Amino acid sequence: MMKRILLAEDDNDMRRFLVKALEKAGYHVTPFDNGASAYDRLREEPFSLLLTDIVMPEMDGIELARRASEIDPDLKIMFITG
């Protein structure tokens, strides 16, 4: 089964780069440009990994990670920043 990554990154260039690199490595990536939208999707379906920027509009990565852990305590979370 293909690993599913939820990506929250507000920088368009970085988001496109990460999607391309991760998909090339065989992952299914669902990208969002803010934490609030990523959180909404996480409430609808499971993911193997949350890859999130820290500073974003609407909901920052720290808050997204906190809320994501409440939904799925086993979800792996990685922070990125640039």
Can you describe what each PLM-predicted range is?
Residues E45-L51:
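Active-site beta3 strand of CheY-like receiver
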Residues D53, T81:
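Active-site residues of response regulator receiver
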Residues N34, D60-L64:
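Acidic catalytic/metal-coordinating carboxylates
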Residues G26-D33, R41:
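Short hydrophobic/Thr-rich beta-strand motif most characteristic of the beta2 strand and flanking loop
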Residues D13-K24:
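Charged docking surfaces used in two-component/phosphorelay signaling
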